[in-house]
Design a protein with these regions (language model features):
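Terminal, low-structured helical/coil segments at or just beyond the last alpha-helical repeat
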Residues: 150, 157, 161, 165-217
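Alpha-helical segment of the N-proximal tetratricopeptide repeat
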Residues: 26-53, 57
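TPR alpha-solenoid repeat register
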Residues: 64, 97-98, 105, 139, ...
Length: 217
């Protein structure tokens, strides 16, 4: 009798364990988190698959579109990156995710449009991101969660390049000044005479210098 009772208890426990295992499945957050791990390791082809699965699981999961957009950027699928980021920007934030995903999407849109030479769009999204950063309480900075070498200074330099391309030299200089001040608060004002060819050449050289400097950090 005692043996039968123990056997019955064992069967019940095994059944419960099996049922729990069947009920568990990866959530969209699990998929995206693994996608980001792969992204950080440089495995962009596989990260693409995991981010794609995340948004199949939940078509409103903003960070899935964020990850997929950045992955498309790494795969040099720039039009796809822009389209994916744009969809992600329209999705609601997930309150369980501490990262400001909208800021990461705006940065992604800024860089993708820059690579596509769409300067007006660079300014639209880049200025929007800088505005949001400046509304923050405390430190007015932004760093990409999944690559700390990419931050708000890259956004400023990208904006400087696009403003230069559109012949808005005053705004280009202002963005260069923002970078210089962030790197060294004691740096003197950046002054260049952009009414002359030589002055514009100096500004272009400064933009290129800062781009290379920030890449090499």
């Amino acid at each position: 009798m005692r043996y039968n009772r123990l056997l019955l208890q064992l069967i019940v426990l095994i059944s419960l364990f099996a049922a729990c295992r069947k009920q568990w499945s990866a959530t969209e957050e699990d998929m995206a988190n693994y996608g980001w791990s792969l992204y950080e390791q440089g495995d962009y082809v596989t990260s693409y698959e995991w981010f794609s699965n995340a948004i199949i699981e939940d078509k409103n999961f903003q960070d899935g579109y964020n990850g997929l957009g950045w992955t498309f950027g790494k795969l040099v699928e720039l039009d796809s990156a822009v389209q994916t980021f744009a969809i992600g920007l329209s999705k609601p934030p997930n309150e369980r995710i501490a990262t400001n995903v909208s800021q990461e999407i705006l940065a992604g849109l800024t860089f993708a449009h820059s690579a596509l030479k769409k300067d007006s769009s660079v300014i639209l999204y880049g200025d929007s991101l800088i505005w949001l950063i400046n509304q923050q309480i405390g430190e007015k900075t932004w760093t990409f969660t999944h690559d700390s070498t990419t931050n708000y200074l890259d956004v400023y330099v990208t904006l400087a390049l696009s403003y230069y391309a559109l012949s808005d030299y005053e705004e280009s200089v202002a963005n260069i000044q923002a970078v210089k001040t962030a790197l060294n608060p004691a740096s003197p004002p950046y002054i260049v005479n952009t009414t002359t060819v030589r002055g514009r050449e100096e500004l272009a050289a400064e933009i290129e210098y800062l781009q290379n400097f920030l890449r090499g950090r």
